[in-house]
Amino acid sequence: MHPRIIPALSLKFPPLAIFFAQEPPSDAKEMRSLCSMLLVAQAAMGRTMAITRGTCRCPGAGKGLGLEPSNHGTIPGGGECYLHFFPTRKQDLEHGHTMIQKLTVGGASQTMTDDRSGREYLYKTLEGMVQRPGHLPRLQPEAPYVVLKPLEALVPDEKPKVVSLLIEPDQLPALVSLSDRTRPGIDRVWLPFTAGCASMVLYPLHEAERTNPRAVIGLTDTSTRFYLRKALGKEVVAFTVPWGMFVEMEETISNGLIKHCA
């Protein structure tokens, strides 16, 4: 497939097909990483990346990539430790010490363990954080691997669940407009408050199951931007859509619309 949207928007990076697989594709590269965003960067450079539960040392990556159920009780230190991560100092909790020790044993970098032992200040109160898990999509993993692959490199038996476009902010208006052209309403795009991996995989997968799916703007998480800045630059955001929605957008590309928006 040669997407029309690439020349229309002069995309710097190839659209990424994201799908599940029982086995890694023959052209896939498997590598361990601290953060899944480093693997996203590899895919953006044209490589096929196959990710499984043990690939990333970040304890939230398996959930954000749809490889584990959204159950935060399985995070090192337990659910209580997770809840206290954002609004309070986890190093003051017994569970917090457990999580930090497990991360260290697992080979996490000093940067990551220092980050997890402090605060992210994303929630003002614990009460706000307690409500967060109830808003997360509940998806069951479809296969052991999630694959990130340039859309143009797909072989006939590979079909993406979602497609992610890594774009610059000036290209966002065109994609928002394309998303809203074919269906009524004004809520075809949203930006969830979530991790980078979840914004590219978990939430778009959830949207793919809805009757009226939405595009998901992502890579707005502060940690995500730290890991991607060196590899892809500081201007990159993600615009991820279910496969059917991407096909609709491809069919309705308007040169006039692109000229005014991109």
In which residue ranges do the predicted regions lie?
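Acidic, serine/proline-rich low-complexity intrinsically disordered regions
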Residues: 2-262
